[in-house]
């Protein structure tokens, strides 16, 4: 595994690899790697000649007062995990190399960015779209891999790729869960023991919502049931959203249809957790 820190060098390596006809699979991450990330890497290894992983805690996707400073960082441990998987390149840029003084260009995917998480994290998806756009230009992947846990993010990136004519295939892989159903997330590290136990209610509520939809319940009644489940969990400090949405538009669904997105964002203590299920 070769570690590259300078965007220009990473771009030159990628350009040469593509010129030689090598397919590049790319997994952009913010580090604190867990089994969810590793599953994306394994899939990329199966489908590409070369696998490149980036680790970059992107400041532009954190709003003021969010957890940018305390976001978990352990690059040495991450390197060990990546070496064990025998990836080809780790791209490890610093903030100044990607956002030098005078930087002033951002990518905004209108519409989708203003729904769900976008309501509670203003500017978040502008930061996500911008950094992914930059990374795609540097790494030049044929395929890029994302997890379904960040469903809205993957939808926004697909839209950006389509609208801006990127030659990248976006592959969204299933959410990887702990044994008790909690979606794997770097932010789970923030939870104390009681909060960690409390967090299992998210998946339980999603599964209950799935069951009710499959039994023919109306989406609005499913939403009410999910909120009821969360309100009975004393450690939940705030329910930001929980309900039934259209998987393409992210609009709330009020009538029955063929496919649904069940999605949740809430805070347990100071930790914001998200999760979702697709129901067909």
Curated annotation (Swiss-Prot):
Pathway: Cofactor biosynthesis; (R)-pantothenate biosynthesis; (R)-pantothenate from (R)-pantoate and beta-alanine: step 1/1. ATP binds at residues 30-37, 147-150, 176, 184-187. It is found in: Cytoplasm. One of its GO terms (molecular function) is pantoate-beta-alanine ligase activity. One of its GO terms (biological process) is pantothenate biosynthetic process. Its EC number is 6.3.2.1. It is an enzyme of class 6 (ligase). The active site is at 37 (proton donor). NCBIfam families: cyt_tran_rel, panC. This is Pantothenate synthetase. It comes from Thermodesulfovibrio yellowstonii (strain ATCC 51303 / DSM 11347 / YP87). The gene is panC.
């Amino acid at each position: 595994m070769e570690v590259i820190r300078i965007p220009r060098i990473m771009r030159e390596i990628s350009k040469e690899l593509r010129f030689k006809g090598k397919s590049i699979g790319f997994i952009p991450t913010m580090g604190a790697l867990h089994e969810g990330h590793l599953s994306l890497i394994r899939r990329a290894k199966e489908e590409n000649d070369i696998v490149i992983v980036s680790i970059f805690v992107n400041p532009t996707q954190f709003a003021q007062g969010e957890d940018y400073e305390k976001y978990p960082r352990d690059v040495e441990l991450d390197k060990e995990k990546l070496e064990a998987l025998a990836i080809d390149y780790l791209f490890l840029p610093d903030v100044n190399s990607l956002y030098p003084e005078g930087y002033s260009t951002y990518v905004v995917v209108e519409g989708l960015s203003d729904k769900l998480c976008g309501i509670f994290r203003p500017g978040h998806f502008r930061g996500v779209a911008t950094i992914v756009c930059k990374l795609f230009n540097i790494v030049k992947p044929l395929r890029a891999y994302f997890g379904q846990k960040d469903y809205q993010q993957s939808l926004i990136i697909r839209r950006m790729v389509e609208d801006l004519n990127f030659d990248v295939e976006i592959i969204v892989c299933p959410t990887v869960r702990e044994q008790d159903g909690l979606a794997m997330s770097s932010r789970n590290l923030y939870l104390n023991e009681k909060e960690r136990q409390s967090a299992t209610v998210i998946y339980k509520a999603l599964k209950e919502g799935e069951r009710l939809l499959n039994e023919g319940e109306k989406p609005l009644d499913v939403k009410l049931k999910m909120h009821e489940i969360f309100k009975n969990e004393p450690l939940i400090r705030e329910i930001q959203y929980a309900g039934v949405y259209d998987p393409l538009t992210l609009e709330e669904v009020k009538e029955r249809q063929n496919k649904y997105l069940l999605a949740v964002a809430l805070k347990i203590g100071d930790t914001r957790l998200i999760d979702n299920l697709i129901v067909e």
